[in-house]
Amino acid sequence: MNFLLLLLAAYALGSTPFAIVSSRLFGLADPRRYGSGNPGATNVLRSGNKAAALLTLVGDCAKGWLAVWGAAKLGFSPVEAALAGLAAFLGHVFSVFLRFRGGKGVATALGVLAGINAWVALSALFVWLAVAVLTRYSSAAALAAAVITPISGAVLLGATPTVAVLALIAGILVWRHAPNIRKLMNGSESKIGASKS
């Protein structure tokens, strides 16, 4: 397969809006119209339907992982597989199916990390869980996980181009959370489990 075609396929895969799909399957409102307005698992959870939120989480993680795994299976190099993961991540954030206004990309990024290196993914997940439990803020947990990712990547993978891809994903995650950072600073950020109103 041509590398450009791989990137396009990974982007299309990443663009699949599982938050919208799962909400329709469970007869829920469009998650872009309540809570934070973000089409992601945390916002779907605000609907009160944990099954829909779980399906969203699994779907968003899976598409990131599948992009990396599929690229590796097709014989592409580790950095090319990581770039396929980046394409899937960008597909989620700038979904062609949602007029290029997708989600924050946290779950998809975790899937990409899992495809690249399980230990890097586990370190990010551990940090996310720890901060989420301590603060009850999904955004704070995501920011902390984003910061640790290129660090753990450098430790575990060395100075490789793949780590640069991880750093780029982390930077985009922080940028996508800019409104949440402002809300955290002024005390208006919603906590995990808050209602959708």
UniProtKB/Swiss-Prot annotation:
Class of the enzyme per the UniProt entry, highest EC level: transferase
Q: What's the Enzyme Commission number for this chain?
A: 2.3.1.275
Q: From the UniProt annotation, give the residues forming the signal peptide.
A: none
Q: GO BP, one example?
A: phospholipid biosynthetic process
Tell me which SMART domains the record gives. Answer: G3P_acyltransf
- GO CC annotations? plasma membrane
Topologically, how does it sit relative to the membrane? Multi-pass membrane protein
The metabolic or biological pathway listed in the UniProt record of this protein is: Lipid metabolism; phospholipid metabolism
> What InterPro entries would the database entry show?
G3P_acylTferase_PlsY (IPR003811)
Name the catalysed reactions: an acyl phosphate + sn-glycerol 3-phosphate = a 1-acyl-sn-glycero-3-phosphate + phosphate
Where on the tree of life does the source sit, at the highest rank?
Bacteria
GO terms (molecular function) for this protein are: acyl-phosphate glycerol-3-phosphate acyltransferase activity
Segments traversing the membrane = 1-21, 78-98, 112-132, 155-175
Alphabetized, the UniProt keywords read: Cell inner membrane, Cell membrane, Lipid biosynthesis, Lipid metabolism, Membrane, Phospholipid biosynthesis, Phospholipid metabolism, Transferase, Transmembrane, Transmembrane helix
Per UniProt, subcellular location reads as: Cell inner membrane
Q: Name one Pfam family in it.
A: G3P_acyltransf
On assembly, the entry states: Probably interacts with PlsX.
Purpose of the protein:
Catalyzes the transfer of an acyl group from acyl-phosphate (acyl-PO(4)) to glycerol-3-phosphate (G3P) to form lysophosphatidic acid (LPA). This enzyme utilizes acyl-phosphate as fatty acyl donor, but not acyl-CoA or acyl-ACP.
Return the HAMAP family for the record: PlsY
User: Belongs to which family?
Assistant: Belongs to the PlsY family.
Tell me the protein's name.
Glycerol-3-phosphate acyltransferase
| Organism name | Aromatoleum aromaticum (strain DSM 19018 / LMG 30748 / EbN1)
User: What broad taxonomic lineage does this protein's source fall under?
Assistant: Bacteria, Pseudomonadati, Pseudomonadota, Betaproteobacteria, Rhodocyclales
